[in-house]
């Protein structure tokens, strides 16, 4: 995959279109402690993609179920 450098700015619609086309994975872990006592821990894993992108990925890694076998 080649990386292209562009000096033109992108509109929000173009950014959203690219995110939905390629997909984005957000993986975050936050821990709040006070004097060594964990008060709160938050773990987030989120995927943002279009349904078409997800279906292509799911088919490629074998996550889809054949309707004829169910």
From Swiss-Prot:
It is found in: Gas vesicle shell. The keyword Plastid does not apply. The keyword Repeat does not apply. It comes from the Bacteria. GO terms for molecular function: structural molecule activity. Keywords: Gas vesicle. One of its GO terms (cellular component) is gas vesicle shell. Gas vesicles are hollow, gas filled proteinaceous nanostructures found in some microorganisms. During planktonic growth they allow positioning of the organism at a favorable depth for light or nutrient acquisition. GvpA forms the protein shell. PANTHER family: GAS VESICLE PROTEIN A1, GAS VESICLE STRUCTURAL PROTEIN 2-RELATED. The gas vesicle shell is 2 nm thick and consists of a single layer of this protein. It forms helical ribs nearly perpendicular to the long axis of the vesicle. Belongs to the gas vesicle GvpA family. HAMAP family: Gas_vesicle_A. This is Gas vesicle protein A.
